Amino acid sequence: MRERIEALIRDYQKNKMELKCLEHQIRNFRGISENEMIDTMYFTQPEGERVQTSGVSDKTAKIAMSYRERMDAMNEEWYQHLEKQYFALAEEISFFESAVKALPGKMGEIMQDMIFSQASWDELADKHFVGRTTIWRYRQKAIDERVVLYEKHEAEMTAYMLS
């Protein structure tokens, strides 16, 4: 669990950027076009036994009859995949942010500046009038406290899912 929290701290800005990218993809979703779908269907090789009955016209007829349904299904699947990723990442970021903001006193202020503002350790030391060792101790203590919180959160989610 400790490694997970350290990864969340380290990757916070990357995760926020990924969330914005997913939001942009969802807002501007266009899906696969009709021409792309027809090309995909036309140039794929059939699976299973190969018995050719009437050549190209049979394949063309099948494509003409089913391309729209397959295109809509693929687009819907992809859109749902993007939404699922977005909501999972948004929930993870939201819980992480609230967990960091819940840290008490100077430790909370330092961790918020470290994570959300991406302040360097020297900037943190100057701003909060503490040494680098104190910042390191605050960071370790904050991670330890968040481990307990995340373990409790995970246990609650597991209990809910099993009930």
Task: List where the protein language model places each region.
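N-terminal interaction/assembly modules
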Residues: 1-99, 148-163
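A broadly tuned, weak detector of single residues within folded domains
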Residues: 5-8, 104, 128
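Short amphipathic alpha helix immediately N-terminal
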Residues: 102-119
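Helix-turn-helix DNA-binding module
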Residues: 118-134
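DNA-recognition helix of helix-turn-helix
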Residues: 129-149
